[in-house]
């Protein structure tokens, strides 16, 4: 499971010099991620807040999670400060989303170089990825965690990784994972019933963050952004027409992105903008809220 898959190492000069200093310091100090914390906890690096919840629910008191992309930041563009990178040198495991999220394409190999002994877990291993294409390049939708069915796969991968780095506590990790998986099963069933009975078939969103959730529960997602960019005037007109034809009354936007186009469309259709984030740490509560918002989006 020790992953050495290479990503897109495009240079990010703002922190490049600091990264080199940290890399040299880690090598000099012999940091390999194998030293346990003084309190006995296993240090686990994670990319996004939902993964932090997964790790903490499975790991319990045995782990300390280091969050690389903080709440409110955009993992497509975020650059970690040197202090966070220094913390990674203490980690025994990195729970990477593993789905092509831009932060990891830019930083995963650099993070692994800081800590060669660290186990890198692809949390999306086993997920049926959604293919995308930008500027003629094939890719995958990175937002795997937004569907509870995928979250269950990610929790299993995290559990396996924790057992590998800390076999002494394997029983606790398995029990914790099973308990959390039961909660995810309940969430999955509740969302399925909620959306099936809502009459909603299509949602419009500012950024294509919810394709896995909409796929799993029989909805269609229309994204306002065009290949990650604000829509052209022509596309905006098309989206307004489409929203009217689909009788869409709510445009969903995320706090990590601009709401300008969502507000324009909402004004034109006499609707409203509702904020939903795919990056809240409280995964169960947030996903339940998002599904409820989707289910009520066609009401006057």
What are the functions of these language-model segments?
Residues 2, 30-300:
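Extracytoplasmic metal-acquisition and chelation regions
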């Amino acid at each position: 499971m020790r992953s050495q898959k290479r990503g897109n190492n495009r240079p990010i000069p703002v922190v490049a010099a600091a990264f080199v200093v940290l890399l040299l310091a880690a090598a000099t100090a012999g940091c390999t991620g194998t030293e346990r914390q003084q309190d006995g906890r296993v240090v686990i690096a994670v990319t996004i807040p939902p993964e932090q919840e997964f790790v903490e629910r499975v790991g319990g008191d045995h782990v300390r999670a280091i969050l690389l992309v903080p709440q409110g930041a955009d993992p497509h563009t975020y650059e970690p400060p040197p202090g966070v990178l220094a913390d990674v040198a203490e980690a025994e495991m990195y729970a990477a989303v593993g789905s092509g999220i831009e932060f990891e394409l830019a930083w995963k190999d650099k993070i692994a170089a800081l800590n060669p002994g660290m186990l890198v877990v692809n949390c999306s291993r086993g997920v049926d990825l959604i293919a995308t294409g930008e500027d003629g390049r094939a890719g995958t939708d990175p937002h795997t965690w937004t569907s509870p069915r995928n979250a269950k796969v990610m929790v299993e991968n995290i559990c396996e990784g924790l057992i590998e780095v800390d076999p002494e506590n394997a029983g606790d990790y398995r029990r914790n994972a099973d308990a959390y998986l039961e909660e995810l099963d309940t969430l999955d069933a509740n969302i399925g019933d909620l959306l099936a009975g809502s009459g909603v078939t299509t949602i419009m969103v500012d950024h294509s963050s919810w394709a896995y959730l909409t796929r799993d529960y029989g909805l269609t997602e229309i994204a306002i952004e065009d290949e990650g960019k604000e829509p052209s005037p022509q596309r905006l007109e098309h989206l307004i027409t489409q929203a009217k034809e689909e009788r869409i009354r709510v445009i969903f936007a995320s706090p990590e992105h601009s709401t300008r186009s969502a507000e324009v469309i909402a004004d034109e259709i006499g609707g409203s903008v509702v904020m939903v984030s795919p990056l809240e740490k409280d995964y169960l509560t947030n996903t339940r809220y998002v599904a409820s918002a989707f289910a009520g989006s066609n009401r006057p």
